[in-house]
Amino acid sequence: MSMLQQVSVAKKANVYFNGKVISRSVVLADGSKQTFGVVLPGEYEFSTAQGEIMQVISGKFDVLLPGKTEWVAYAEASQFELAPNVSFSIRTDQISEYCCQYI
């Protein structure tokens, strides 16, 4: 199990889509921010305010990246990068976890 050291964790969860996507914000010792979340089965559209690297921690996601028309499968331990100010969609048929690193 990969562990983070010397972090601050927000007490309150970020809850989206009526509780079907829930994440926690973490601030690392260097001041950078990440969120760790759980996604229940379904399809969801998100928007970015800044660049992001999304890593699949467990489960799998199909992702419709900005400007694309075909879904791309991302399995556990894979990742994809998003530019600032874009929208993208995620769908999954199982409980899945992710880490979002802001860049």
From Swiss-Prot:
Instruction: Give the UniProt keywords, A-Z.
Output: Glycosyltransferase, Transferase
Which catalytic reaction applies to this protein? a purine D-ribonucleoside + phosphate = a purine nucleobase + alpha-D-ribose 1-phosphate; adenosine + phosphate = alpha-D-ribose 1-phosphate + adenine; cytidine + phosphate = cytosine + alpha-D-ribose 1-phosphate; guanosine + phosphate = alpha-D-ribose 1-phosphate + guanine
**Mind listing the GO molecular function terms for this protein?**
guanosine phosphorylase activity; purine-nucleoside phosphorylase activity; thymidine phosphorylase activity; uridine phosphorylase activity
InterPro entries per record: Ppnp, RmlC-like_jellyroll, RmlC_Cupin_sf
* Cellular component annotations (GO), alphabetically ordered: cytosol
The record's EC number reads 2.4.2.1, 2.4.2.2
**Gene3D superfamilies recorded:** Jelly Rolls
Q: Into which EC class is this enzyme placed?
A: transferase
Q: Does the keyword Transferase apply?
A: yes
Q: Explain the purpose of this protein.
A: Catalyzes the phosphorolysis of diverse nucleosides, yielding D-ribose 1-phosphate and the respective free bases. Can use uridine, adenosine, guanosine, cytidine, thymidine, inosine and xanthosine as substrates. Also catalyzes the reverse reactions.
User: What family does the entry list?
Assistant: Belongs to the nucleoside phosphorylase PpnP family.
Identify the HAMAP family for this entry: Nucleos_phosphorylase_PpnP
| Protein name per Swiss-Prot or TrEMBL | Pyrimidine/purine nucleoside phosphorylase
What is the name of the gene encoding this protein? ppnP
